């Protein structure tokens, strides 16, 4: 958490486990219509009870015959789109995630890779974070396709980020979270 940024402190993540946040012991973001086969029929009780630490995640991959995975953030992907958090605090939160996920992947880097989060409020900070993520061994940077401060990802504002991605060889992974709201859509 960035010193002096109470708005970020208020949004500090914390774990909540319980029936209200699970569906038959699957993460809550799986819709009720998700078939059991999505997990290959694997019993993921151990992973749930372990809080999905890296070792239990690898065991779940083994149970489902998954060789390797690229990890994306969940709730963290929304950080760069909080308009009331300073750009520095957004970058600090993205850096914290990158540090954590790099350590998580270090459990078995032959099987686990990850993308960092681009703090898109400030393209220079995003470029700095891309270089840092590359140094940590991450394979890309995530950006949501939503408009931010009236800009889409094709805006020249983001050139410093794109230059850093080209320099480091990282990919830009564009991934929406819960659906684009309030922005332009195809055909509009």
Regions found by a protein language model. Name each.
Residues 1-188:
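Helix-coil boundary/capping segments in enzymes
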């Amino acid at each position: 958490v960035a010193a002096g940024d109470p708005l970020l402190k208020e949004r500090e993540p914390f774990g909540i486990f319980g029936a209200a946040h699970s569906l038959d012991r699957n993460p809550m973001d799986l819709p009720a219509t998700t078939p059991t086969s999505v997990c290959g029929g694997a019993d993921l009780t151990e992973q749930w009870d372990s809080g999905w630490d890296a070792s239990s995640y690898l065991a779940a991959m083994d149970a489902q015959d998954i060789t390797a995975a690229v990890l994306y953030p969940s709730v963290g992907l929304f950080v760069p789109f909080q308009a009331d958090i300073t750009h520095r605090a957004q970058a600090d939160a993205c850096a914290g995630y990158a540090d954590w996920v790099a350590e998580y992947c270090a459990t078995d880097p032959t099987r686990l890779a990850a993308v960092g989060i681009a703090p898109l409020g400030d393209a220079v900070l995003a470029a700095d974070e891309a270089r840092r993520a590359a140094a940590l061994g991450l394979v890309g940077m995530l950006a949501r396709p939503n408009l931010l401060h009236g800009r889409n990802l094709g805006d020249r504002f983001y050139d410093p980020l794109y230059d850093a991605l080209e320099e480091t060889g990282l990919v830009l992974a564009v991934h929406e979270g819960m659906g684009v709201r309030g922005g332009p859509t195809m055909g509009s």
